[in-house]
Amino acid sequence: MKKELVIIGGGPAGMSAAVAAHRSGIRDILLLERDEHLGGILQQCIHNGFGLHRFGEELTGPEYAWRYEQMVQETGMEVMLNTMVLEVTGEKKIIATNASLGIFEIEAEAIILAMGCRERAKGSLNIAGTRPAGIYSAGTAQ
């Protein structure tokens, strides 16, 4: 399979990148998400406060994710849910797997990595020092 743009991660950054790429004229886009729904961490953020700047009203995380998911669907781009990326090579080849295709390869002209993050204690990062420069937890960034 060949694609002009592959976006790995269907959370807020991945969906936003997909919509922005489509608006800039790219049409051959594939969005890969390992979970069964788009939205990433937004699905866990049940408090209000999202969407005020983008949509002009306060939304919960799942509501905000749903709005962005609708924008992605309106583009008609290909979205693969329940798809795990196993490897990304220096030649812009992606090895991925899902239940319907098994293990498969995608050749991309460009790749956007939008996989999000998980919070871990500083000791589990194996980086010396009290806090790695430029790395912030999701809680700190809020």
Sequence positions of predicted segments:
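Beta1-alpha1 glycine-rich phosphate/pyrophosphate-binding loop at the start
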Residues: 3-67, 71
